[in-house]
């Protein structure tokens, strides 16, 4: 069987990818602090900020393909430099690279963003992910206002151009077996009699984790290179999505209250809905709307 390396294999998406890919691939998955055991797959501890260790692992395993899901909300260098190291190592061993990105590379001013729309992130995480996209493929447009700093600009200028890579921008990942962290928080809060405020003016395109993983694995075997949006077909506010989840799980929806992002002090994009026409035409994997799965 062909060999597949998945970074961030102990994360929510990474674990699902390992579980699904091991049927058709010899899989190695990496972790940093959260070591987990997944039968019929091999694990490796890896700090992707350590370039030499990244290159060593790639040369030892020599993967045919790589899915890069590892990231950190707390250390943005993991996103920027870590992605650069993974892209360099993938190129060095001739591996196909699938890089996971986010709808947060957009400012959320209008929604239904296409792959060729210029990223304009408004918070540090989105800016780091936009820079990471450029490190994977310099054909990705990026407004100059999103530059992190002069050092980051020099990193971009010397970045690897991985022409065989695909960049998958996605949205809110959710699932019930196991639950994603947001759903688990909602369940725990409502079961304890608490109240949870969810924004009515912040829109995303939630995608079921199993279907996202299936789409990514399908993409591995295609010749597609460049950016592709893989997200749910339904634009939903966080409030609407939370209510649907609570009803499906038999929870007390009265504990969910509407809130307004614009009245908070948070700097967050309001409407990051993604146009997924390209993915619908390219992939056989069907992506369901939450309203279908939670009915």
Language model features with spans:
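N-terminal Rossmann NAD(P)H-binding glycine-rich loop of SDR-like oxidoreductase domains
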Residues: 4-23
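NAD(P)H-binding glycine-rich loop region in Rossmannoid oxidoreductase-like domains
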Residues: 45-85, 91
């Amino acid at each position: 069987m062909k060999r597949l390396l998945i970074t961030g294999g102990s994360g929510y998406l990474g674990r699902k990818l390992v579980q699904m890919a091991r049927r058709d691939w010899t899989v190695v998955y990496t972790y940093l602090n959260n070591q987990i055991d997944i039968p019929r797959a091999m694990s490796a501890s890896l700090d992707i900020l350590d370039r030499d260790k990244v290159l060593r692992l790639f040369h030892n395993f020599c993967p045919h393909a790589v899915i890069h899901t590892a990231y950190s909300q707390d250390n943005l260098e993991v996103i920027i430099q870590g992605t650069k190291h993974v892209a360099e190592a993938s190129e060095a061993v001739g591996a196909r690279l699938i890089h996971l990105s986010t709808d947060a590379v957009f400012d959320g001013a209008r929604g239904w963003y296409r792959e060729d729309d210029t990223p304009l992130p408004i918070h540090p995480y989105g800016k780091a992910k936009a820079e990471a996209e450029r490190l994977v493929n310099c054909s990705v447009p990026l407004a100059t206002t999103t530059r992190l700093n002069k050092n980051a600009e020099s990193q971009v200028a010397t970045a690897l151009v991985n022409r065989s890579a695909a960049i998958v921008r996605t949205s809110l990942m959710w699932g019930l077996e196991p639950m994603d962290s947001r759903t688990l928080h909602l369940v725990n809060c409502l079961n304890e009699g608490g109240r949870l405020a969810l924004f009515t003016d912040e829109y995303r395109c939630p995608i079921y984790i199993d279907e996202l993983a299936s789409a990514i694995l399908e993409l591995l075997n295609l010749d597609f290179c460049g950016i592709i949006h893989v997200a749910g077909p339904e634009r939903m506010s966080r409030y609407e999505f939370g209510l649907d989840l609570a009803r499906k799980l038999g929870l007390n929806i009265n504990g969910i209250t509407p809130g307004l992002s614009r009245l908070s002090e948070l700097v967050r994009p309001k409407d990051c809905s993604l146009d997924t026409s390209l993915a619908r035409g390219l992939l056989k994997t069907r992506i369901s709307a939450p309203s279908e799965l939670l009915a």
